[in-house]
Amino acid sequence: MEDFVRQCFNPMIVELAEKTMKEYGENLKIETNKFAAICTHLEVCFMYSDFHFINEQGESTIVELGDPNALLKHRFEIIEGRDRTMAWTVVNSICNTTGAEKPKFLPDLYDYKENRFIEIGVTRREVHIYYLEKANKIKSEKTHIHIFSFTGEEMATKTDYTLDEESRARIKTRLFTIRQEMASRGLWDSFVSPREEKRQLKKGLKSQEQCASLPTKVSRRTSPALKILEPMWMDSNRTATLRASFLKCPKK
């Protein structure tokens, strides 16, 4: 699974997933399914915000790469993928600026058009079951929930899907591609089945001492509005590279 993740996802996403697992004391060489799940979730969050801007009239607009209007304000602030300290700093800054209610748990995105935090879910199970789990955990009507599955299903708070159909279809296509690529390598069943995952985890624990620790580079993200907090984590060239890789999943 680890080899698949490194081949299928952009190196910047892999790097962020490595950092996240290290922050929580998890070993990606043992918990490979979690490694794959984190990378998938990160990519969906990036794709959710991709190309979406707000124009001078405060309306949402979709801008393709290379368009001179790309200097418009980003519609979504990406919170997922930051270290916890920086993530809460961003959340606090958003709340102070917009008057939004501070969430109990770290959300994944903030939507400047709808003025709400968004929790993104990617599930291998039934979307309605995962949605209810998220809702019961968050216990806040202020945070919008949007769940995607690998089968093309989705569920959102009050059936408000936030994005246009084409943007959501791009996310669903990517998830379906990941599922197909996993299946072609015989990885999908273990990714879906908790029992098989536990068996793989137990097997990995026995060989834990043989696993070399993975060096992790710290990589941070922030929007132009928060440049006073720290430098931009990614310039336009790196952003373009990341976007161009979204639908690529090379085979072995």
From Swiss-Prot:
Site (Important for efficient shutoff activity): 28, 65, 202-203, 206
A Pfam family: Flu_PA
Principal subcellular localisation of the protein: host cell
Keywords: Decay of host mRNAs by virus, Eukaryotic host gene expression shutoff by virus, Host cytoplasm, Host gene expression shutoff by virus, Host mRNA suppression by virus, Host nucleus, Host-virus interaction
Positions of the catalytic residues: 80, 108
Cellular localization per UniProt: Host cytoplasm; Host nucleus
Residues marked Important for efficient shutoff activity and nuclear localization (site): 195, 198-199
GO biological process: viral RNA genome replication; viral translational frameshifting
UniProt-listed InterPro entries: PA/PA-X (IPR001009), PA/PA-X_sf (IPR038372)
Recorded superkingdom: Viruses
GO molecular function: RNA binding
Entry similarity comment: Belongs to the influenza viruses PA-X family.
Domain commentary: The probable endonuclease active site in the N-terminus and the basic amino acid cluster in the C-terminus are important for the shutoff activity. The C-terminus acts as a nuclear localization signal. The C-terminus is recruited to host protein complexes involved in nuclear Pol II RNA processing.
Function of the molecule: Plays a major role in the shutoff of the host protein expression by cleaving mRNAs probably via an endonuclease activity. This host shutoff allows the virus to escape from the host antiviral response. Hijacks host RNA splicing machinery to selectively target host RNAs containing introns for destruction. This may explain the preferential degradation of RNAs that have undergone co- or post-transcriptional processing.
Descriptive protein name: Protein PA-X
Species in which this protein is naturally found: Influenza A virus (strain A/Henry/1936 H1N1)
Underlying gene: PA
